[in-house]
Amino acid sequence: MAAETFLFTSESVNEGHPDKLCDQVSDAVLDACLAQDPDSKVACETCTKTNMVMVFGEITTKATVDYEKIVRDTCRDIGFISDDVGLDADHCKVLVNIEQQSPDIAQGVHGHFTKRPEEVGAGDQGIMFGYATDETPELMPLTHMLATKLGARLTEVRKNGTCAWLRPDGKTQVTIEYLNEGGAMVPVRVHTVLISTQHDETVTNDEIAADLKEHVIKPVIPGKYLDENTIFHLNPSGRFVIGGPHGDAGLTGRKIIIDTYGGWGAHGGGAFSGKDPTKVDRSGAYIARQAAKSIIASGLARRCIVQISYAIGVPEPLSVFVDSYGTGKIPDREILKLVKENFDFRPGMISINLDLKKGGKRFIKTAAYGHFGRDDADFTWEVVKPLKFDKASA
């Protein structure tokens, strides 16, 4: 390995992982509430273990929601249809413990629904980050994109019958050798690919390895990144028959790096799933991603991070920060000025500008395979805003 290159790794889990099951249930509840009442205030957590799923939290909504049906439908859609695969959607225990939003929080944030959008305060304090890089068409880190796409492909070949031995739970991890080009990240080659997937009792380790290479890795990872030295760890622990909630307990909000940038950039610690847009953990991270992506797409920098922070009940962010890692065409302070001029970071306005009060089947799509770098009209924060700057002076 040449001296100037380095290795970096990102991981992902697919929709049958117990933590991701919980994220999807929480966002399915949010979708159901917003579909009937766009002003729903939702903070929905989910946990699961063998033969049990529980939803709990604070929800204030005019919507009529059948929580048990949402849980069972979500688990069934993932593929949890029998105890053999880790959970039986139609026969597991479903527990529900939902209360109304605290009146203290309601008064401080939205004045019990009386405040105009521009007056709505942040639902809590916190810090959020957005990140973007020019190393992929999605303006996302390649390690993260490949790990995520491998997980999505595992699910695809399970559901379409290509690899009938697959079961819902699975994890992926990709290590890439990078070149640091003046602060910009240039992928050189894929160093290691790791896949651990749940499977049925009938398949052999050799069959697993052959199918994963042919039907999962080959369609996802561009050949130019693979060479004779690329390392493959395919189900390295051997058997992985017991999975899903039977294998491990699951909780909402446990996969926040997988949801974002795969360890690149930074993370404020707040999870996304099950939260309505007054929760800046979610809406703040979405607008920060849009700002960071727009900086790169507009040619202002090759890589950048944006941080914003909030106080509970206060509409305006306390701080906005931009760092282009030395790749900026103009000074970071000028990029920051453009960001502040072009983006409204007040939570009520983020909701309007990114259309975050729309439910349906929208947010459940974010709850597996990443919230960013997705080509889908519902991912409104991925729409680039052109940022105009004086190229002559740059």
From Swiss-Prot:
ATP binds at H17, D169, G170, K171, S237, G238, R239, F240, D248, R254, K255, A271, K275, K279. InterPro entries: ADOMET_SYNTHASE_CS (IPR022631), S-AdoMet_synt_C (IPR022630), S-AdoMet_synt_central (IPR022629), S-AdoMet_synt_N (IPR022628), S-AdoMet_synthetase (IPR002133), S-AdoMet_synthetase_sfam (IPR022636). Its cofactor is Mn(2+); Mg(2+); Co(2+); K(+). Pathway: Amino-acid biosynthesis; S-adenosyl-L-methionine biosynthesis; S-adenosyl-L-methionine from L-methionine: step 1/1. Keywords: ATP-binding, Cobalt, Cytoplasm, Magnesium, Metal-binding, Nucleotide-binding, One-carbon metabolism, Potassium, Transferase. K(+) binds at E45. Homotetramer. This is S-adenosylmethionine synthase 2. The gene is SAM2.
